[in-house]
Amino acid sequence: MASSSLTSKSILGSTKLGSSSLPSELRRLSSPAVQISLRTQTRKNFQIQATGSSYGTHFRVSTFGESHGGGVGCIIDGCPPRIPLTESDLQFDLDRRRPGQSRITTPRKETDTCRISSGVSEGMTTGTPIHVFVPNTDQRGLDYSEMSVAYRPSHADATYDMKYGVRSVQGGGRSSARETIGRVAPGALAKKILKQFAGTEILAYVSQVHHVVLPEELVDHENLTLEQIENNIVRCPNPEYAEKMIAAIDAVRTKGNSVGGVVTCIVRNAPRGLGTPVFDKLEAELAKACMSLPATKGFEFGSGFAGTFLTGLEHNDEFYTDENGRIRTRTNRSGGIQGGISNGEIINMRVAFKPTSTIGRKQNTVTRDKVETEMIARGRHDPCVVPRAVPMVEAMVALVLVDQLMAQYAQCHLFPINPELQEPLQIEQPQNATAL
């Protein structure tokens, strides 16, 4: 039987077609009495949003820029109006994140001075998109000449090529930690909103560098202060362990090597009721946000993996009513989250960061053309990322919480329930609190 070759044509309209309505190629193959059913062709419109560069639903942040481009920054959409905001409010956390602040960070020198160009009028947010920009001023593109050909082991060089077929060689482009400027700036704003609303405090600190592990019982999470954390260059609140951590970083820094570590983050006075079952549980959102940071390799909250060694009786947090009539838990192995919803206790989590992949030691690798070779990476890189990761973790936690807070108001506060079940555990509002 001879084969037929039919051209592809768009047939729009009814799916029931008589032979007279068919294209000539089909008419020759059919009898007049035959009705042929065809699936109508529908034009599909695809909407693509800066894939992978945005986070949040109600308080939405989109970051842009590359390590060795003209600059980096973000657009914040959904910020409530009438929030007092100046560039200095954002600059404090950007300074904590910036490179070149001590001998245990990258020697790249950037002031990371931010500029707000929209969304703020006379020191108050207007409710419209806020644009924040930080220029790059200390690029050294020639440091990456070898990396334009060969891939750095355990870096995103290879996977960016595999996915896109092209990559920004200088500084790693979007995979560079410099992208996190666009997270830390809106994170500072999110912390400000949370503080004004409920006195919520978010504090992160370094709890481990390589083999130096700070015992949790040495940190009083109820009374921990930012001053204790910022008292040393490694951002560990315990001076004795801080010195040990600095020594561990110095030991590998002088040899062109690197080490990893852990950042612990706590949230005090978190509003109750944040988080939505079942796929948008609060701990799931926190994990996603924190694990999106560069170099992260692990996340746990509450008792974490250690909880697997306990029985149910040992692990359960028993309830009681405190002197103010509030429902509390005597222990906090749940980490302030139960059933994916915040219960008002201190939220605590730990984020693991791998050793910096770009090191000044000889390593085996391959080129883009699959030729095996050796590489000694040049450039300026952190011997350990965790001291600078502290404000990054705080920022991501703040972005999650402020987005969840706005979602809570959108869903559950149209017809409010007993307010005592949802108010933060803090009895008095901070003096500078304003209604949002």
From Swiss-Prot:
Reactions the enzyme catalyzes: 5-O-(1-carboxyvinyl)-3-phosphoshikimate = chorismate + phosphate
The protein's required cofactors: FMNH2
Compartments in which it is found: Plastid, Chloroplast
Domain of life: Eukaryota
GO biological process: amino acid biosynthetic process; aromatic amino acid family biosynthetic process; chorismate biosynthetic process
Annotated transit peptide: 1-50
Known function: Catalyzes the last common step of the biosynthesis of aromatic amino acids, produced via the shikimic acid pathway.
Subunit structure: Homotetramer.
Protein's name in the database: Chorismate synthase, chloroplastic
Species this protein is from: Arabidopsis thaliana
